[in-house]
Amino acid sequence: IAGGEAIYAAGGGRCSLGFNVRSSSGATYALTAGHCTEIASTWYTNSGQTSLLGTRAGTSFPGNDYGLIRHSNASAADGRVYLYNGSYRDITGAGNAYVGQTVQRSGSTTGLHSGRVTGLNATVNYGGGDIVSGLIQTNVCAEPGDSGGALFAGSTALGLTSGGSGNCRTGGTT
């Protein structure tokens, strides 16, 4: 499974995988949104929940918005992002976004969308006391289910989809 593809929570709910990562000890994890991993500890790669992705290894939300799922099968951890046109992009490193940078976002509801970074270190109040700070702000659209998906530029990982306003028909901020 690659970045941007759908992941399914035990008991219901769908998010998107951001990037597959490896620890210094060689363990592989799926990186996604923390508001996703907080709702379930077991995750699957299919909606019928017959193909196990793995179990939650950690969640940081609110404050931050990221979570780690330990892969049950390390060979399933694809180092690419799915571009929703039948092809994939190799991700070879991580970097820091900058204002004006052209970026792409891959997610399981709306696929691949492009735009620019419009701000850094943004803070968003999602309500109910859920405040997340240190975010990259873009003019790339997103919709529910895109959460956790990959934000990247070329072969460089930049971040994960946390949330946004608007949608991919009329546009929005993510």
Swiss-Prot record:
Coiled coil: none annotated. GO terms for molecular function: serine-type endopeptidase activity. GO terms for cellular component: extracellular region. It is found in: Secreted. Its EC number is 3.4.21.-. One of its GO terms (biological process) is proteolysis. It is an enzyme of class 3 (hydrolase). Its main location: secreted. The active site is at 35 (charge relay system), 65 (charge relay system), 147 (charge relay system). The keyword Ligase does not apply. Keywords: Disulfide bond, Hydrolase, Protease, Secreted, Serine protease. InterPro entries: Pept_S1A_streptogrisin, Peptidase_S1_PA, Peptidase_S1_PA_chymotrypsin, Trypsin_dom, TRYPSIN_HIS, TRYPSIN_SER. Disulfide bonds join 15-36, 141-168. The keyword Translocase does not apply. It comes from the Bacteria. Belongs to the peptidase S1 family. Broad substrate specificity. This is Serine protease 2. It comes from Streptomyces fradiae.
